[in-house]
Amino acid sequence: MFGGRLRFKNKENAIVWIVNTHKELVNLVTVINGCLRTPKIIKFNDLIVWLNNKYHYNIPINSVDTSSLNSNGWLSGFIDADGGFKVRYTEKRVDVKTNKVLTKGRIEVRFALEQRKNIGTNINESYKPIMFQIHSFFGFLTDLRESKHNADQTYWIVEVSSLNRLNLLIQYLNNYPLLTAKRNDFEDWCKVYQLIVDNKHLSDDGKLLIKNIKSNMNKKREIFNWNHLIYLNKV
């Protein structure tokens, strides 16, 4: 679609897509110009200035896209990169001697999206505005939460567990599908979501099914389905 080449980073379990020919670069810039919502737009617009000056183009410089997140697939792409679909399955544990509950049983679905606080020291390089917009997308009226991975890494986090709020996400991702392997996790996560909505997660069969689904999600996944890539034909 855009050309370029792939570089495999085996140690990091990652693939890097590199676009470096002039034609491919200009094509990519033209397609995504006006669609950016994060502080990365600063470097992107610097690239446009360089292209315009170097090659006498007249590529327009746009500000951050502030349209509704429901209006396009940008959030879907952001989730593909950094979102997480989680299933919590905690079995009830009881002391056989005292009959005291040691651990309460709990089953829930959760969505989490984390992003570093900023990409520089300038206030315009903060991720807070876009993360707050995503936070508001789910109907939250409170301020953003922070998540610390260690002493020097602090992130903004949007975390959702309410079934009603998660339904907003499901509707959105049905309209703007995920395109990476994360689509597989989303579909399995939706199965657990529906079991909870239907109160089937409380039955022995439901618990067993959820346990099996969870065992093949995210980093534990061994079975992949790529049928969803058909959506690329609509791009």
Report the location of each language-model feature.
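Internal intein/HINT superfamily modules and their associated LAGLIDADG
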Residues: 1-235
